[in-house]
Structure formats: C-alpha cells, structure tokens
Amino acid sequence: MASIASGPAQRPLAAPPEWCRNPCNSRKRGTVIFADVLANPAALLPFVLIGFAAQLVDGALGMAFGTISSTLLVGMGVPPRVASAGVHAVETFTTGVSAISHVAHRNVHWPLFFRLVVPGVIGGVLGAYVISNVSAETARPVVLGYLLAIGLYLLWRGITHRHTEREPRIVEPLGLIGGFMDAAGGGGWGPIVTSNLLVQGASPRITVGTVNTAEFFLTLVISATFLFTIGLEAVSTATLGLLIGGVLAAPLGAVAAKRMAADRMLVLVGIVLIITSGLGLAKLLS
C-alpha cells in the first residue's frame, strides 16, 4: 500500500553548538585541557611567564595585559573573538586580585571609580555583542594612531616634568569608549582610560589604582556576555597559563604603582603606549 504524504518535506533544524547540545561537554573540555597540561606541563610555562610579565606592567601602569595577551593569542592563530573572550576570562581573576591590592594600598579614588565603572560596563556589553556578531576592526587603525600620539605626549610630559595634578573633567565618555573597545578589541580599557585621565592631569597613582579596580567589574560583565554568546570556546592551555602568571603578579603591581614617582610613571606609560600601538599599526599596514 502506497504511503500518503502528509505535506511538504521539512528542512532539518540547524544543530546547536557542541557545548549547547550536551552541557557535559564543557566539563569534558576542561578535563581534556587539564589532562594535556599534566601530560606536558612545559607547554604551560611560556604562557605563565607572559601572564606574569603582562600583569606586572598592567598592575603598575594600568594597561597592557589585554593588549599583550590578545596579540599573542591572535598571532598563534586563535580567532579574535575567542582570544578576547579568553583574555577577559583570565582578567576576571587577575583584576580581582589587583583591585584588592590597590584598595589595600589606598590607590583608589571612589568618586572617580563610580564615574568610570557604570559607563564602562555598558560599553563592555555592547562591545562583546559587536565582536560576537560583526567585525569591529574598522576603527582599529584610528584608535591605534590616537593612542600612539597620546603615548608620545605623555612621554614628553614625563621627561620635561610638566605634570600638574588636577581633577579630570571628561570621565564618563572615556568609560563608555574604553569598555566598548576593550571587549571588541581584546584590550583597550587601560590604554584609553588611563592615558586620557593622565592627559587631563589626574594623579598617576590614583588613576592606575582606580582604573584597575573598575576593570574588575568590567571584565566580569564582559566575560559573562561572552559566555552567553560563544560558550566555553575560549578555555585553553594558553588561558590557564595566563591566569596562573597573572594572579601571581597582580599584588606586585599595586606596590609598584604606590611607590613609583609620577614623572617616571608617565614616561613608562608613554613607552608602553608607543610600543603596543606602534606594533599594532605596523601589523595592520604590513
């Protein structure tokens, strides 16, 4: 007897991502990574050293962990959105330890903190959504060129001892833009926010401590957004190594920020901005 068709054939639904199909797979992924590390612990060491060095600079100068780490991961072939998600997952822990250290050393100005953290979180959520769905690389050359100019200016001010401390006026827009670029580019909160507050005359020690403390809440929200949009794709041996090195170095950065002279800090911030922005521009132009 011939079968009777009940209607037009329906197209099968697209299969959901692996981590959504089976929630246990996220646990399996973590198990595989730890098994790989135990089998070859030497593979973890380079990432531990990079995380330690990057966080030491970030804790003392308020920038560079995200930029250095993301550049490294992308250079090794990791997709930009996965690299950004992995770095922010690591920074959730490193910025938490760094924030506690800066608060303990009285490097935080709380009115400035609250003016930064709310727009920063809003910008971070928008940036995480953008990089998870579209490319945000169009604005990258402009941002890098701007940060290179800021680096040269801060270097000049530090060398010529022209830093006069005063209350910064433009804060909330910096938080919004810094949060957006940090999520969309895998790094940018420190370079954009710290450098522009220093240009306005804010105290280097207070600026670094406040920006780093606000960054904890920013990375927490960005990481949650990435987890919702791309899952646990960012978990890897590299992120585990960056996490270990970063957490070990986080308390030391706050001590360095407290003891470093303002002019010397401006010079070092300028040098870091010039190097990271210059390398980024060279890579884009090559």
Which residue stretches match the model-derived regions?
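Juxtamembrane transmembrane-helix boundary motif
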Residues: 3-4, 8, 12-59, 64-80, ...
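Transmembrane helix-bundle signature of multi-pass membrane transporters/permeases
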Residues: 55, 84-92, 208-216, 273
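Early transmembrane hairpin of solute transport permeases
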Residues: 75, 85-101
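Small-residue-rich packing faces within the transmembrane alpha-helices of Major Facilitator Superfamily
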Residues: 92-95, 148-151, 216-220, 274-277
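Secondary-structure boundary/capping motif
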Residues: 98, 189, 212, 218-219, ...
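Hydrophobic alpha-helical transmembrane segments of multi-pass integral membrane proteins
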Residues: 206-225, 237
